[in-house]
Amino acid sequence: MNDLTITLKQAAKEMEFDLTENQTLAFEKYYNLLIEWNKNINLTAIIEPKEVALKHFIDSLTCLKILEIPCQANVLDIGTGAGFPGIPIKIFRPDINVTLMDSLNKRVNFLNEVIKKLGLTNICAIHDRAEDFGQKKEHREKYDYVLSRAVAKLKVLSEYCLPCTKLDGYFISQKGPDIDEEVKEASKAIEVLGGSLLNIHKLQLPFINDGRSLVVIKKVKQTPSVYPRKAGIPAKKPIA
């Protein structure tokens, strides 16, 4: 048994995730593809098996500790990069529908290869800008859960994610340990975009002193049609 598998199984047990053998094999295939493609395109700086198991795979699953996502729920991962958190969640929860969105076509090509090689179904990867994606009728307020892992500051991320979140759905931002000031700065944006801060869950990744914060925002009213604004504007002029 290799380092990735040993660490993954131990950490999953610690976090009370019951991984099957097929799911473990899927994570191994995912890791091998990640390392292979990372030689040619910049997917991740984290490549050691133990670190990938903890800081990518297990970290991606942490939101499942705080939310009971129902069968057939529609989940969107904005700014997914190399597929985190969306692909690990799909491996562990094959019963949900996952959409991965990223602004770089090379990364989307990688995601499609992973989907194909792992034989994943009811999952797709889309090449788009978050600002454009959220204005499209087929995506606007269509997702039960919108996830994003440390893509931008929360006040910017909210403008990317809340327009795609269904009324009474949830936007979950996966962040590092020191999040309080960032949440405070985002309070106006969250309100304007139709969200309400529900909770901030703090946790530690197993075996390493690495804290995480999961910011849970509920969609309580429709997002005004002017949001998200045109590409580049949310980052340059965040709602304040």
Curated annotation (Swiss-Prot):
Record's GO cellular component terms: cytosol
Subcellular location(s) of the protein: Cytoplasm
CDD domains per UniProt: AdoMet_MTases
Annotated GO MF terms: rRNA (guanine-N7-)-methyltransferase activity
Keywords (A to Z) from UniProt: Cytoplasm, Methyltransferase, rRNA processing, S-adenosyl-L-methionine, Transferase
Top EC class for this record: transferase
The keyword rRNA processing is assigned to this record: yes
Record EC number: 2.1.1.-
Binding, S-adenosyl-L-methionine: 79, 84, 130-131, 149
Entry superkingdom: Bacteria
Record's function text: Specifically methylates the N7 position of a guanine in 16S rRNA.
Protein name: Ribosomal RNA small subunit methyltransferase G
Phylogenetic lineage: Bacteria, Bacillati, Bacillota, Clostridia, Eubacteriales
